[in-house]
Amino acid sequence: MKMKSGMEQAVSVLLLLSRLPVQASLTSEAISQRLRVSPSYLKKLMRTLVQAGLAESLPGTKGGFTLTKPLADITLYDVYQAVEGRGSMYQGKGLLQSVFEGESHCVLETVMAEIEDKWSNLMREESLQHVMDRVGELYDLEKIDDWVIKQVKGQL
């Protein structure tokens, strides 16, 4: 199973935004520099996250992006749907019907849909808060918090 790199980037952006102090935001320029992605790509990703209701865009010269809700209320499935879209992962071509003539129902499509449902349910159970908790076990969050504060102060 393969996901676009946008999934990891979107999760990273949302986790980064969660480190913001109350009433603060991060510019797309700061986020793109931190993630080492092109500013134009980051703007497209941010538009996607805003349209999905996961991030908010604040206008003005001191504007930027912030989360719309706590990480505990955002699931990996929410992010996946925002980045990958709502279509089915598996698109059958009807080859089984060609091999085993006579049946109009694609068994493989049914099996793949069942697997996709299970996978989707697992992603619905994983909040970004749980991901952040695991990040905190492995990384020094103080470093990113210091970087975030520096960026916020630079906007003032």
Curated annotation (Swiss-Prot):
Gene Ontology CC: one annotated term: cytosol
Keyword field contains Calcium: no
Keywords: DNA-binding
Signal peptide residue numbers: none
Pfam families: Rrf2 (PF02082)
GO biological process: regulation of DNA-templated transcription
Limits of the HTH rrf2-type domain: 2-133
A GO molecular function held by the record: DNA binding
InterPro entries found in the cross-reference section: TR_Rrf2-type_CS, Tscrpt_reg_Rrf2, WH-like_DNA-bd_sf, WH_DNA-bd_sf
Classification via NCBIfam families: rrf2_super (TIGR00738)
This protein's name: Putative HTH-type transcriptional regulator YwgB
